[in-house]
């Protein structure tokens, strides 16, 4: 549905369009004519139809496009969809030259041509079409003059008919004149303004002669009349009488002729004129109308009207006839005489073109040529001629004249060369790319001849040896006067061989003599962008120093292009990966650096440089640019740490690695080659330049010095050189090379424990020290022997010996507890000491206790000494004594017991002279000299002597007041006890080495750049120990070790009868 700008005009518009239905919607084997309907005077962008849909072409991919080759003055087409619509210029049917003399609705049309173009113009089809322009009611019918004058003789009989001037309407058909109306003048008497109409339904056949007498009605025609009342208050009793009536007749040429009929008597003496209103109305919707004053003058009698010999005159006229050439003579006769019989000829309802081209002699009726007539402009003239006498009033007759303009071969063929598809063509020059395919249409050639028949039959050809040929644009046989051809390429084009062709096209018609014409087209072969820019090298490598100034040129890359013009103009660009770092001049190819390069951050840049030409399509080439950033000595050497801390074990062999420092230089080459030095070198350490490993030149003694601190300097090889320093702290770690030393109790001392002591009574406290540090000095106490009754236990940490069992009669006597003290080193070192406990109420015989302690020093540690061994025997003897009442038996028994006791005691004394090398039934603990460690040599100045670490030390005074040397005095000569091992002991002699020596060796210490700092003392890496000091308690200190020596028995007469021991006794109770 079309939208009109005004409501009234829209109704006529819509009825005139009915909209835009194509008359041909399919394409059969041959191309058909596309026909559409369109109402005139429509706005822009009114849809007419879809060419693609009507041709059955699928659109949407963009590969097939449409182009309007002709008709673009009023029409336009969408290149992709094929939608045909109106352009900005309005279509006025009445102003179209081809519709001036057209009275058939289907004969007024606009021609157009549409080309359908395949992909890359590989094929082109041309289709013709017509848009039939439908008339709308846009013109108002008008009379020749606003006042029409008609002369009527008085006393004319009723029924006399007079022809009235006709109105003209530029529209036709139903929009043309439909009816005439006669309106009574207001105030003129009669019917007081009443109107009567004579229209299409009121019309009658046009009378043959059209006369104006009583018989003017002619024959065979029915009439509808409109009365005009005579006023003036005459004899008409009603004041009104009918005088005139309007009748409309249909003429042979299809027009409507208004006629005035006399209905009443006319008396000039009573009234000499009448003024009526004649209205004309067309058949449009809404209708248009206009009116004129019809002035009727009553005159004397003119009896007869002129009459033409024919109602229709038809003649042929050759075009281009010279002005003045007679065509035909119109003849009419009038029976009147005198002035009433004199006839003059005038044009009737004729168009302006008729009056411009023809001349009608008013007296003779000769029709002649006024101006040359061109058949190509007007092929037929149809008009009316009026014959009018000179009577008062004059009478008229009308005849139709039809002139057929005959053709002459007066037009040379016309050659029009237009663009087709996407090939540009302007001012007779077509630009064709060299890579077009053979048989590609490059232009549309239309050859036409305005002549008719053989004069308009045209043939066309291409002149000369050019790679082009003409092919018909349509497969159908169309109008021979108008032919269309495609100008195709016949061979490949080569820009390098020929860059321009002058194509001459000649057209010849078939007239006699024939006429010909020619037209030319310059075809310029365009260079195709078929060569990409090329670089001389696929990889360009440059070296550029760091710390540059932004904006410096790094390198220049150049590319060449074998094409020409825009196709050879090159623009350079860089990868987006280095945008901001580098830039390139798009014209010169100079690569510039935008920032300061730092080789230590990025030492190499690799990117692509693209060279693009400016052709269509754009082609490009590329090369890889590698920028190696050259180093400058702008970085100091850098140690991984400002302070390196290492831990090494004491007694490490000289020239052993003690640590490793790591230093780096962000520079490169000689700037990164470094030399390492130890500042303030005291010849204790050296450093390896390549690895940074630090070596010691001596063996470390933790007891001598625990830490070493020095500085390491690194100097690079730059010019000038750069340097850096770091501090190295070396901590000497302790080795478990000292066994625990027991300070209390002494081996010869004992503790008196009353039998009434309660459980958890503290019996004694074992105190020991260790010269080592850390976990090597963590001591653990344990009872390893002499506790068969489980009466005692020792706190493993504090060394406190407590009573844990109830003492009974059988527990009376001496108890020898073997206590072992172990450190926590790896491997562990240990020492063994003796704790003597005498269970009794009091010490009644100190000598006997001293004797028992002395004997216990020679008894193997595997043999328990706990309580009175003769307790059971004494109990039996007591039973015998109780049983024997007799005195003699008692005396005898006592004597025997005393004798046996003395005998046994004497025997035992001889047995305690152990210590001689030839007696191997038992052994005592002996400390072994540690001669392996050089640092302990100063402690071993005395000769090696057996040390009784497994016996009780008893302090006694010599008779002269000096302190008796005990067996344990030998221990002061050696700092630690050796490992226990069996020396040909007798049966039952213990192997203390098997029971008490440590097993696993120290783990291997790996050197690292920095030794880890130990946490707790039981970690794998020990904390640095304090100074290794040995704690002693005078000459009689018992020092034990986990190293066990051979047992040797040396009494040196220390336990002879002449000697009396005065032991220290601790008494509980």
From Swiss-Prot:
Residues 930-944 have a biased composition (Basic residues). It is a single-pass type I membrane protein. Glycans are attached at residues 79, 689, 747, 780, 822, 840, 845. It holds the Pfam family Cadherin. It comes from the Eukaryota. SUPFAM superfamilies: Cadherin-like. GO terms for cellular component: plasma membrane; platelet alpha granule membrane. Residues 901-1069 are cytoplasmic. Residues 207-221 have a biased composition (Gly residues). SMART domains: CA. Expressed predominantly in brain and heart and at lower levels in various other tissues. GO terms for biological process: cell adhesion; homophilic cell adhesion via plasma membrane adhesion molecules. This is Protocadherin-7. It comes from Homo sapiens (Human).
């Amino acid at each position: 549905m079309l939208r009109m700008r005004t409501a009234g005009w829209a109704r006529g518009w819509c009825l005139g369009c009915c909209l835009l239905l194509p008359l041909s919607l399919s394409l059969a084997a041959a191309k058909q004519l596309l026909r559409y309907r369109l109402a005139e005077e429509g706005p822009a962008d009114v849809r007419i139809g879809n060419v693609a849909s009507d041709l059955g072409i699928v659109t949407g991919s963009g590969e097939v496009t449409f182009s309007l080759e002709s008709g673009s003055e009023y029409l336009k087409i969408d290149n992709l969809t094929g939608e045909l619509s109106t352009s900005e210029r309005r279509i006025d049917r009445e102003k179209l030259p081809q519709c001036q003399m057209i009275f058939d609705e289907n004969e007024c049309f606009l021609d157009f041509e549409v080309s359908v173009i395949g992909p890359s113009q590989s094929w082109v089809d041309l289709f013709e079409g017509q848009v039939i322009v439908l008339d709308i009611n846009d013109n108002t019918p008008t009379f020749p003059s606003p006042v029409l004058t008609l002369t009527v003789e008085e006393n004319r009989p009723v029924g006399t008919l007079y022809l009235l001037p006709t109105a003209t309407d530029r529209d036709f058909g139903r929009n043309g004149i439909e009816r005439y109306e006669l309106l009574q003048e207001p105030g003129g008497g009669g019917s007081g303004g009443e109107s009567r109409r004579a229209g299409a339904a009121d019309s009658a056949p046009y009378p043959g002669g059209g006369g104006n007498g009583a018989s003017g009605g002619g024959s065979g025609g029915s009439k509808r009349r409109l009365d005009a009342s005579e006023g003036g208050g005459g004899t008409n009793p009603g004041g009104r009488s009918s005088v005139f009536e309007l009748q409309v007749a249909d003429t042979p040429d299809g027009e409507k002729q208004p006629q005035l009929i006399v209905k009443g008597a006319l008396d000039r003496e009573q009234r000499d004129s009448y003024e009526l209103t004649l209205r004309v109305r067309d058949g449009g919707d809404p209708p248009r109308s206009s009116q004129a004053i019809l002035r009727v003058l009553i005159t004397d009698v003119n009896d007869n009207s002129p009459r033409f010999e024919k109602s229709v005159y038809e003649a042929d006229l050759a075009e281009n006839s010279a002005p003045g050439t007679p065509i035909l003579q119109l003849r009419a006769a009038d029976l009147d005489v005198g002035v009433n019989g004199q006839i003059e000829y005038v044009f009737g309802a004729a168009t302006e073109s008729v009056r411009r081209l023809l001349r009608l002699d008013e007296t003779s009726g000769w029709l002649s040529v006024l101006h040359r007539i061109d058949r190509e402009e007007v092929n037929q003239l149809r008009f009316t001629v009026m014959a009018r006498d000179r009577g008062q009033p004059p009478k008229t007759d009308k005849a139709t004249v039809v002139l057929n303009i005959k053709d002459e071969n007066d037009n040379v063929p016309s050659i029009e060369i237009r663009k087709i598809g996407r090939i540009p063509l302007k001012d007779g020059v077509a630009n064709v790319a060299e890579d077009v395919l053979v048989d590609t249409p490059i232009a549309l050639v239309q050859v036409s001849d305005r002549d008719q028949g053989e004069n308009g039959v045209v043939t066309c050809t291409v002149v000369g040896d050019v790679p082009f040929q003409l092919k018909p644009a349509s497969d159908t046989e169309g109008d021979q006067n108008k032919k269309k051809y495609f100008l195709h390429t016949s061979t490949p084009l080569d820009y390098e061989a020929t860059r321009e062709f002058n194509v001459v096209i000649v057209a010849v018609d078939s007239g006699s003599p024939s006429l010909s014409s020619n037209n030319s087209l310059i075809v310029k072969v365009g260079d195709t962008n078929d060569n990409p820019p090329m670089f001389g090298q696929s990889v360009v490598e440059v070296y550029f120093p760091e710390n540059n100034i932004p904006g410096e040129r790094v390198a220049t890359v150049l590319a060449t292009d074998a094409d020409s013009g825009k196709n050879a103009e090159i623009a350079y660009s860089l990868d987006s990966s280095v945008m901001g770092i580098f830039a390139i001049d798009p014209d010169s190819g100079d690569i510039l650096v935008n920032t300061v390069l730092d080789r230590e951050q990025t030492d190499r840049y690799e990117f692509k440089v693209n060279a693009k030409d400016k052709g269509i399509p754009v082609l490009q080439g590329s090369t890889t640019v590698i920028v190696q950033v050259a180093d400058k000595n702008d970085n100091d050497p850098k140690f991984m740490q400002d302070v390196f801390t290492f831990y090494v074990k004491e007694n490490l062999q000289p020239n052993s690695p003690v640590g490793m420092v790591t230093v780096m230089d962000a520079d490169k080459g000689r700037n990164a080659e470094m030399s390492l030095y130890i500042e303030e070198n005291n010849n204790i350490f050296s450093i390896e330049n390549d690895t940074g490993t630090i070596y010691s030149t001596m063996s470390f003694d933790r007891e001598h010095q625990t830490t070493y601190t020095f500085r390491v300097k690194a100097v690079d090889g730059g010019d000038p050189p750069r340097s850096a320093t770091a501090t190295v702290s070396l901590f000497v770690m302790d080795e478990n090379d000292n066994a625990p030393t027991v300070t209390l109790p002494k081996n010869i001392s004992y503790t008196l424990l009353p039998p009434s002591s309660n459980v958890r009574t503290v019996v004694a406290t074992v105190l020991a020290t260790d010269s080592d540090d850390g976990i090597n000095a963590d001591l653990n106490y344990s009872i390893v022997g002499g506790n068969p009754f489980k009466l005692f236990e020792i706190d493993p940490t504090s060394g406190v010996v407590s009573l844990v069992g109830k003492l009974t009669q059988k527990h009376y006597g001496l108890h020898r507890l073997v206590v072992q003290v172990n450190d926590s080193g790896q491997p562990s070192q240990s020492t063994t000491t003796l704790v003597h406990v005498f269970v009794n109420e009091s010490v009644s015989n100190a000598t006997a206790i001293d004797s028992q302690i002395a004997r216990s020093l020679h008894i193997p540690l595997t043999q328990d000494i706990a309580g009175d061994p003769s307790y059971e025997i004494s109990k039996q003897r007591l039973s015998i004594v109780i049983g024997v009442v007799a005195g003699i038996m008692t005396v005898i028994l006592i004597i025997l017991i005393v004798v046996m006791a003395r005998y046994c005691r004497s025997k035992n004394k001889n047995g305690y002279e152990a210590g001689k090398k030839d007696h191997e039934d038992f052994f005592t603990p002996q400390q072994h000299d540690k001669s392996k460690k050089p640092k302990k040599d100063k402690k071993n100045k005395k000769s090696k002597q057996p040390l009784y670490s497994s016996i009780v030390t008893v302090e006694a005074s010599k008779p002269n007041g000096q302190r008796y040397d005990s067996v344990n005095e030998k221990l002061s000569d050696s700092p630690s006890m050796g490992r226990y091992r069996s020396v040909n002991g007798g049966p039952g002699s213990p192997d203390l080495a098997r029971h008490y020596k440590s097993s696993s060796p120290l783990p291997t210490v790996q050197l690292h750049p920095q030794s880890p700092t130990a946490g707790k003392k039981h970690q794998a890496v020990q904390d640095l120990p304090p100074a290794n000091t040995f704690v002693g308690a005078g000459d009689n200190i018992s020092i034990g070790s986990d190293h066990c020596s051979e047992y040797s028995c040396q009494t040196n007469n220390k336990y002879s009868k002449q000697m009396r021991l005065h032991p220290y006794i601790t008494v509980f109770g």
